[in-house]
Amino acid sequence: MDLTKLTAHELKDMLSNKEVKAEEITKAFLDRINLVDNKLGAYLYVSEEEAIKKAKEIDGKIEKNEELKALSGIPVGIKDNINVKGMQNTCASKILEGYTSPYDAHVTEKIKQEEGIILGKLNMDEFAMGSSTENSAFKLAKNPWDLERVPGGSSGGSAVAVAGSEATLSLGTDTGGSVRQPASFCGVVGLKPTYGRISRSGVVAFGSTLDQVGPMGKDVEDCALLTSVIAGLDKKDFTTVDKEVPDYKKSLTKDIKGKRIGIPKEFFGDGLDKNVRKSVEEAIKVLEANGAEVKPCSLPLMDYALSAYYIISSAEASSNLARFDGIRYGYRSKNFKDAKDIYLKSRSEGFGDEVKRRIMLGTYVLSAGYYDAYYKKALKVRKLIKDDFQRVFKEFDAIVSPTSPTTAFKVGEKKDDVMSMYLSDIYTVPISVAGVPAISLPCGMIDGLPVGLQIISDYFKEDVLFNLAYNYEQSVDFHKMRADF
């Protein structure tokens, strides 16, 4: 039996029944990483010795018949912008090359408390800015379904690790679609939770009012399991909400009778690949046949979401990334005349093109004379978009759309076409702007490439997402697909 192909809940059952040891599982994944990651590029750092040590500790507890915790013995990969004590945290940027985390992020602490085995740090677009993971300063991540195609981004390594059987579970971050879009491209399940549901403490900030940590797994049950572990109040992050975290496993039922689902026409317009549309429409029919009430709806301000997003996120990025200056830590230029020269050259040499592009845009929209015309106006648009969603959720329990307008595109295809790259997130960005939760799960295959279905619900209604996603998933077999790599 290939342990790397199994889900977290399948591995948990085997560990509980003493059919396998945690060390066996861990070594199987480490062997897999050593075998395939030179081609897939999911990992930027692998913690082999520490992972085996933790696995042996868990086996000792199992031998003593101690009760297993939620993630005992389950291999997890962590995006390289989330702090793990003693491991690198580079954000896939030269400016942080060689930086080691002195502490754990809150989500990392929670995973360790539940005895998850952290295998290492995962590849990403530099500082989480990108939609293809081509912006990594260190290596290219490739889609396990087709090595000539991108895995999506910015959490491309997180999706590749799960789809390529290099981790059972992974964590990514989602600012404008960076968990959902790569989940769609790689055929795995990925959740962007409600803003404030999961702590950002110990996560390197890109857009502070947009960033959220999100789980990825092979199926909905795995995604719900990891969400239950990492969700909840964190006193170190004042944006987290003191709201009880439900037992998401109870949401995993096939009963969706009477659930009201809206189909927003704005998500099915020009630019949507006809075969992606067909796959999503087939998925909607399945939900309807299973008892959901499906009706059309409208979110008329969605056309403005992408513009508002890039103004707000770039403004926040220009502020957040000001701390990387070549003085305290990270990359420092070797050729400088004075302190000003250190700042200028370290940042110019340390940041990649996309990061510099967004810093410049953000600085521009925050500057005197343009603040009112761009940034302030974008905040007003954001409020109207939130109102749009609230209006729709008075009538519907959830809305359904494609996750991305296309399947995974070829490596290099959009690298020099910035607008085309940005448009690959056109269906995920509005959800991030509003701060509501959404999940992506596979709903079809086109020419050997996965298609993603996005389900969106109201604030803190992740249980509704898991219910609908699980119902659909159990009616089809797309979650059982494994990349033959």
Swiss-Prot record:
Active site per database record: 79 (charge relay system), 154 (charge relay system), 178 (acyl-ester intermediate)
Keywords of the record: ATP-binding, Ligase, Nucleotide-binding, Protein biosynthesis
UniProt KW DNA damage keyword: no
EC primary class: ligase
Enzyme Commission number(s): 6.3.5.7
Single GO BP term: translation
GO cellular component, as recorded: glutamyl-tRNA(Gln) amidotransferase complex
Gene Ontology molecular function, alphabetical: ATP binding; glutaminyl-tRNA synthase (glutamine-hydrolyzing) activity
InterPro entries: Amidase, Amidase_CS, Amidase_dom, AS_sf, GatA
Reaction catalyzed: L-glutamyl-tRNA(Gln) + L-glutamine + ATP + H2O = L-glutaminyl-tRNA(Gln) + L-glutamate + ADP + phosphate + H(+)
Pfam families on file: Amidase
Function: Allows the formation of correctly charged Gln-tRNA(Gln) through the transamidation of misacylated Glu-tRNA(Gln) in organisms which lack glutaminyl-tRNA synthetase. The reaction takes place in the presence of glutamine and ATP through an activated gamma-phospho-Glu-tRNA(Gln).
Family that this chain belongs to: Belongs to the amidase family. GatA subfamily.
Name of the protein this chain belongs to: Glutamyl-tRNA(Gln) amidotransferase subunit A
Organism expressing this protein natively: Clostridium botulinum (strain Hall / ATCC 3502 / NCTC 13319 / Type A)
